[in-house]
A protein has these predicted regions:
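Short hydrophobic/Thr-rich beta-strand motif most characteristic of the beta2 strand and flanking loop
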Residues: 26-37
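Helix N-cap/capping motif at the beta->alpha junctions
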Residues: 35-41, 64
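Conserved acidic carboxylate
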Residues: 7
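Surface-exposed beta-strand edges and their flanking turn/coil or helix-capping segments
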Residues: 18, 29-31, 48-49, 57
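Non-catalytic signal-transmission and effector/linker regions of two-component phosphorelay proteins
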Residues: 1-4
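Charged phosphotransfer/docking patches of two-component systems
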Residues: 10-17, 90
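Alpha-helical interaction/dimerization surfaces of two-component signaling modules
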Residues: 15, 19-26
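CheY-like receiver
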Residues: 44, 50-96
Length: 96
């Protein structure tokens, strides 16, 4: 399984990556996890190969909702999981 994490906070990205890797080890899954530090880097480097994208919403340069809308144009079937601590963004995520 290919997983992308788009998260500007290095500590949060590491925690999520560690959780994914522990899950993969526990259930004998092969997971390749790529971490992107912002939405611009992600859109520039992404090769439409992820099964799941964990997307932070509040990021510099371009927020995760805008990045996800761009992603949908090139990869309409990828699963996007929004990660945020800001309740006001929860409903807006369903639009993407």
């Amino acid at each position: 399984m290919n997983i992308a994490i788009v998260e500007d906070c290095a500590e949060d990205a590491k925690v999520l990556k560690d959780c994914i890797e522990k899950y993969a080890e526990k259930y004998n899954e092969v997971c390749v996890v790529n971490v992107y530090t912002d939405g611009v880097q992600f859109l520039t480097e992404y090769k439409s190969d992820a099964d799941v994208v964990f997307m932070d919403i509040e990021m510099p340069y371009r927020d995760g909702l805008k990045v996800s809308a761009e992603l949908r144009k090139t990869d309409p079937l990828v699963c996007i999981v929004f990660i945020t601590n800001m309740r006001q963004y929860a409903i807006r995520g369903y639009d993407v």
